[in-house]
Amino acid sequence: MSVMRSKKELIQSTVRIGVLCCAGLLLGGLVGLCGDASTQGFVHISMIDNSFSPPLQRIPEGSTVLFKNIGRNPHNAVAVDGSWSTEKTYGDLVMGPGAETKVTYPESGVFPFYCTFHATPDARVGMVGTVVVGDVEYEQAAEKKQEAVKEWSGKTRKVPSEYPTIQTAVDASNPGDMVLIAPGVYKEEVVVTTPSLIIRGEDRNKVIIDGEHVRGNGITVVGADGVALENMTARNAVLNGFFWTSVKGYRGSYLTAYNNGDYGVYAFDSQDGVIKHSYASGSPDSSFYIGQCYPCKAIIHDVVAEYSALGYSGTNAGGELYLINSVWKHNIVGLAPNTLDSELLPPQREAHIYGNIVADNNNIKAPYIGLSWPSFGNGILIAGGLRNDIEKNVIINHPNNGIVMLPNLQENFWLSHGTIVKENVIRGSGRADIALVGPISMGNCFSGNSYATTIPFGLEFANGCDAPIRTMMGGDLSMMLGALSMMMDAKLGNLESGDYKTQPVPGPQKEMPADEKEKIQPAFAPFEAHQYLLKSINFHPEAEEYLKGEHGSSSYVGSMQPVVPSGFLAILYHIFGFLLPFVVYSSWTFTALYDMHRQDKKSPIWIAAILVLPFLGSGAYHLSGQSSLPGWYRKTMLWAGAGVFLTLVIIAAALVL
């Protein structure tokens, strides 16, 4: 009889908890429906990285458009005819992440517009859009694109002996021409729309494109396939040093990009490319970036990235994408393939990270933007990525993790699954040499790595790459809460970013060899032409030298220590977000079992529920009236700890989302 009563009470308590949860969800939904009325009645155009959504918007005469930057890069919107711009209403040409402004259109007409940072001024190629106002006819014109060519045309246009600026030489060129630049400091911003050009400096260290911190990009290649940029330096741009966007076929070699305000060497919405023998540093986003492409069919080989927020960032990029035999050091994080909703083609997937040296990525003086700060102190970080491959890398001296896979949150919650981690050497990690972070992880495998610690324990044993079955595992929630606290610090301005304008100036970099200078070739099918780089993947030639250097031993404390750097919020969320639930679980479970013992209750159903269902079983026992503890005591015990935890989560969500 007592067993039947226990069953009934258990069911009633569980139903009661379920009803409360549903009520909470309903209340949350009602609050969400209320929304923010401040943007009602306006047509919206979102600025994504790097496109407008929607690209064509029709509105009645006299209507208003709300432009909002939901990406990570700075953007703007400027009418081709100059009749309006977001600069006039926003007050600044640069609209950073989250910025918004309204533009009203009192008269009918067709208004093509463009982003001055990511498109050509005629709104023909790149980040462009159109607003059609009123009842007017509009049919989008089809532009005839120039075709790329395979070979050099035989024509070389020399700067400055024949053309006073790089831009005038580029504008005069036909597909397949070479623009050869003599040593000098060129204070200009170059936009390339002609395919298959070879733009080369005579001396890598003496041919310098200087943005003087007032011009957007060093060289931008917009919609022009097959353009090669070689043997020169770009510095002090407001945005990017060398930038290809919306192209098929690109090559960058013997490039130096330093102290630019967004990226160093950047390929976006582009396929079939190679970046090699290059150096980039001092960028608040990343030194090297390949983004929004699938399949990318791209190779980054023999590059050095340092003094940036991210050595490499590959948002929504993958599919035959290879990052090989390069050095990533002295950044906030070494390499960080990631998924974000603010760019197209999510999720990030199928990148191959082979034979790299990833060292000392804990540079607190590096420049950064808010989203990059939570990745501090990690070597290789996969944020919401799928089916990536990490092999034969040397990863040393990181205060948090050597290799870490964690979820990423923007509009959607992206988990990291299916990563292969094999034959890496990891040393000197502050939390774990290899770590899984988040509530759940599936399909990741680990084999043949040289390491000291993992979180959770026994990753290679439970999920070997040759095992027929891989175990579904939870991860390090402490790291996830620590990253959340660091994101809050960035949002609140609690941390001062390093200034990209004052990062260390690199010394002379390796010149393009004479035998390579004899080859003049557009970037026609460069991915196929560089397949020889992928035939044999080995450790980096300098791997032994790095391993002989000084590096600390990996920590065995793991999840019990806060993330680094441990500010006030990191410690607060570690104690009350990570450790407190263990205390709450222990107190609920112990008091329930102790109360049953004191009352001499021997219900196997309640005992099983308390032990097998964490929180739910013991919570149901105390709420059902089974407990003899005073009501005030039970309520305090049940709601105090849970209330503190939920309060912290709500505060974090309000600040971050």
Describe each model-derived feature in a short phrase:
Residues 39-61:
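N-terminal edge beta-strand
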Residues 44, 95-146:
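Extracellular/periplasmic metallocenter environments
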Residues 52, 59, 148-187:
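Acidic Gly/Asp/Thr-rich repetitive segments characteristic of extracellular carbohydrate-active
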Residues 75-81, 85, 158-164, 183, ...:
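Right-handed parallel beta-helix/beta-spiral solenoid domain characteristic of secreted/periplasmic
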Residues 91-92, 414-417, 427-555:
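Acidic, glycine- and Ser/Thr-rich low-complexity intrinsically disordered tracts
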Residues 186-192, 204, 210-218, 238-244, ...:
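Short glycine/acidic-rich loop motifs that flank beta-strands on beta-rich extracellular proteins
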Residues 200-206, 225-236, 248-263, 271-286, ...:
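Right-handed parallel beta-helix
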Residues 581-588, 604-625:
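Hydrophobic, aromatic-rich membrane-embedded alpha-helical segments
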